[in-house]
Amino acid sequence: RELLPDLWSSLFMVVPTVSTTFASVRTMFGDLPPESIGWLLVDEAGQAVPQAAVGAIMRAKRSIVVGDPLQIPPVVSLPEKLNVEICKFFDIDQSEWSAPAASTQTLADQASRFKSTFVMDVGDREVGLPLLVHRRCQNPMFDVSNSIAYAKQMVHAVGPKRPGSIGSALGRSRWVDINGDAETKWCPDEGEAVVRMLKELAASGITNPDVFIITPFKIVEQNMRRRLDSETNLLRALGVKLDEWCRDRVGTIHTFQGREADTVILLLGAPKASQLRARQWAASPPNIINVAVSRAKQNLY
């Protein structure tokens, strides 16, 4: 065990970077003493519960923590009531130290010597070193994200707009108003609208379209996949394998964190007035809509 730091140092001379997950840190580096690794780079830190990063950060001399607290928050399996009671027992501020309100990224922002402030509509938000230059999305996706999540402080640095073959077939990014009815959050009329859009792509001769179909709700994902199961000829015309394409291209917003596509079809679901709370949940705080919208590079429907 005494030789482990030297063995890892020898490996790092050959392979400068080793990739792992927080869950595997104990297995890979459990016997290393504190501050025995030179640099720790944490990606997607906004999704990590604070305690997950402790072991890795403890073993590093320096850490760079990169993430966005305004995208997908950490997933917490602990019941909310139990979480609240634990925080009360230990006399800690739940919003500051406990997920999902807190993440590895929010604590890194607090610890940073360098800070910046976002002036929000409701209170201000302090972050460490914000990455304000945005290089993925064209408008209107950039404007939506910039307005709802970043207090219009981001800088748009994307090249000329290229709607591509999908944009030419479906037209400009827009809201598709479906006055449908539903017994659950799944609205069959919205699903039919998605199928019609895919048929327009097939009619235009487009194959293997770079499209994500994203929804906030699991039941909508499941029913959209079932609906596409009956469109084998359509998927064949699009030049894709049904099961593989649905698995990779149709899903909830959590499925697409960190990914991007030419075009996103945002399938909202929950169309009835009595389901308004479900849509409000999907839009406030802005994390979920921010992630969905910012997956699209060129077109959003």
List where the protein language model places each region.
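Active-site glycine-centered loops adjacent to acidic/histidine catalytic or metal-binding residues
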Residues: 68, 213, 258
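Conserved helicase/translocase motor-coupling segment
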Residues: 146-232
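ASCE P-loop NTPase helicase motor core
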Residues: 3-149
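Structural motif
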Residues: 18, 41, 64-66, 214, ...
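Short mixed-charge
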Residues: 96, 116, 230-247
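Conserved helicase motor
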Residues: 22-27, 215-219, 249-256
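Conserved RecA-like P-loop NTPase helicase motor core
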Residues: 73, 244-301
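Short glycine-/polar-rich loops that comprise or flank the Walker A/P-loop
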Residues: 36-37, 59-62, 123-128, 170-173, ...
